[in-house]
């Protein structure tokens, strides 16, 4: 007995993933749980046995009934003991199921190979996990759309290269976040629509074992697979046309890549909000007793957005695992895919699930500081309005070249005062002292709404054309509140 084995065991005595303890929702954790996985295996064995019974193989109705009665009473300790002895997880659960249903023991897994169970179960679980992600992307899009509509016409300074640029609106900027999320949602929906079962194919995908069981009758082999798929709630024509021992591992690469695209969209949204928090323009929700720093009591850190970007970055970096695994599968299959998939697939979903819950929470409680937004606009608008000032002066008879030179000189001087002396932008004050600009309504030329183009109308069109159809498709789940534990 090792020293470690003598220690009392509780939930704090070993490693637990933060994805489980801090980030992922109960629903996503349940989807990737051992109970869900092995319960799905048993349902696959039941579907196989029932289909074999209906085709006249030596599987009795009583045996099928016994299997159905024991789908969920899984003795995990017994399964662990079998696996420690057999070193094979599928066979360990064959024996465990047989212990629970002893009269059916002899027909469990009849004609099957491990991947007839594992690949089909993984497909069912992946479909459900992708559905959760799709629903949560739709929820984030809905909340971003609501925010965009509320602030559709509120001017704010635009930024390119993180340098002041032409104004936009707070709502228009939010549509950019929602559009990225909508692109990600389309990716996820495409993955769901394209999913196929592996079907019943045997050890190398040739169906040789089933052909032998069914007396060489190919039509019965095809009927067996159709019946099996239907009993799992899957369209009979949605199995892979051909496969080796597993379904194509490029499918995992596609799924991980689609999750990475969603993660990149989340990362962009939350990074933008972190920058805006620094500018004191928009902040994520901050609770009454929340602490920003153990040392600096005044701090209001955007910790939710920071955590979401950290989780998103983790998901993006997992995507390479799927490509590596698909590329290195030899011939009909090698087992080096297994250990990697047990980590990369569930953890990508768990991390993205947590990031999406955070994003929905943030979008639902954003705090907009109008005064800060206006102050930053006021500091930059005189420069941006310089062309309109030039045109207005020329229209009143001023020499265009003289007016241009005056604006240039005063703009440079005002810019120097702002950058080098920390003074406010006094360009308008300087221009008011020039006879060239006498009588011009300079303040009127600084109406920020005159510089936002069609931003409000673009918001309206985007919400109507993109957000509203998503709301309609996901109306059953879009109002679900996110679980944010810390």
Tell what function each PLM region has.
Residues 149-171, 283-299, 332-339, 364-384:
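Glycine-rich cofactor-pocket loops
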Residues 218-246:
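Active-site-adjacent "gating/activation" loops or surface patches in catalytic cores
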Residues 184, 235, 244-338, 342:
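Glycine-rich anion/phosphate-binding loop at the beta-strand->alpha-helix junction
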Residues 283, 406-413:
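Active/binding-pocket-proximal capping segment
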Residues 125, 172, 253-261, 388-396:
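Short, well-ordered beta-strand elements within core beta-sheets of diverse protein domains
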Residues 2-208, 214-229, 292-293, 303-307, ...:
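A helix-coil-helix interface module used to build multimeric assemblies
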Residues 307, 314-400, 406:
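Long, amphipathic alpha-helical stalk/connector segments used for oligomerization, subunit docking
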